[in-house]
């Protein structure tokens, strides 16, 4: 059995575990008053639709886990825990750094409260089942030899790419505001239109630069695992990161709103999906253009 098949099976099981744990801690969060009132109504009654969705993402993350397994620190099931904590960093923590400036503090606390339990459990489950299946079906396979580069080599290209990503996000936000596609997010307060535009550019540039610097460092680590050459490597990497971060999060929200017939919110979310995808493509183009493999 190939390692990616083992990863997909382990991910399927871990995705089911993710659903159960998410449901438990989501309900606990609701019971203690987390999440804004307008959002709570969409948070309940989604178990049936969440099961196939979380299993799908579990399979996707399981396949990726099988590809990067030998690059992850630790041994055995601890690799799975590290992998889960990595996703806790780049998904809920990253997402909430974008939401808090808009005043969605209670939602951010609720999401982090659930995620701090869900992602480590997902990672451990993935690590356990991957190891069990790997030991049974690929017991003689040794550690893969993957050529990696110093993560510091990706810091500056990542930071510059993040600045450009932030500028792109700021332009899109201003265009959306001018055309009436979306207004000021819940919790946001502005004094003037110009102030709103400046805040959009400033916030997006700063936050995207910080996270893109981190993504740039990991790009150097997984460079030889990413499809494509030169600039296209950057684009492929960016689209993968979009898929497993913003793309994954948007799919959860989209399903929750669709399950409650909130179709206006669904339409806005679909627009956001393409907007964030565009921003990531800009990041990938610049990263691929600027990154240079360190000299041996």
Regions found by a protein language model. Give the residues of each.
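Juxtamembrane/disordered regions of integral membrane proteins
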Residues: 1-296
């Amino acid at each position: 059995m190939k390692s990616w098949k083992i990863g997909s099976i382990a991910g399927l099981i871990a995705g089911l575990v993710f659903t159960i744990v998410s449901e438990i801690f989501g309900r606990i969060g609701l019971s203690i008053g987390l999440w804004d009132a307008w959002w709570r109504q969409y948070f309940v009654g989604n178990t049936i639709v969440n099961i196939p969705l979380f299993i799908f993402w579990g399979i996707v993350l399981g396949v990726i886990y099988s590809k990067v397994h030998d690059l992850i620190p630790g041994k055995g099931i601890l690799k799975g825990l590290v992998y889960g904590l990595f996703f806790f960093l780049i998904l809920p923590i990253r997402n909430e750094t974008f939401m808090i400036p808009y005043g969605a503090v209670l939602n951010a606390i609720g999401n982090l409260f659930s995620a701090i339990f869900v992602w480590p459990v997902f990672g451990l489950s993935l690590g356990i089942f991957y190891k069990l299946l790997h030991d049974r079906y690929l017991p003689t396979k040794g550690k893969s030899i993957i050529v990696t580069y110093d993560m510091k080599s990706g810091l500056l290209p990542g930071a510059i790419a993040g600045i450009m990503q932030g500028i792109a996000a700021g332009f899109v936000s201003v265009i959306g505001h001018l055309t009436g596609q979306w207004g000021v997010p819940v919790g946001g307060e502005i004094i003037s239109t110009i102030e709103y535009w400046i805040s959009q550019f400033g916030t997006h540039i700063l936050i995207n630069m910080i996270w893109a610097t981190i993504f740039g460092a990991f790009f150097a680590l997984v460079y030889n695992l990413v499809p494509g050459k030169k600039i296209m490597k950057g684009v492929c990497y960016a689209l993968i990161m979009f898929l497993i971060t913003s793309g994954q999060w948007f799919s959860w929200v989209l399903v929750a709103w669709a399950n409650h017939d909130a179709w206006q919110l669904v339409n806005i979310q679909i627009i956001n999906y393409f907007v964030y995808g565009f921003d990531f493509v800009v990041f990938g183009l610049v990263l691929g253009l600027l990154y240079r493999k360190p000299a041996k």
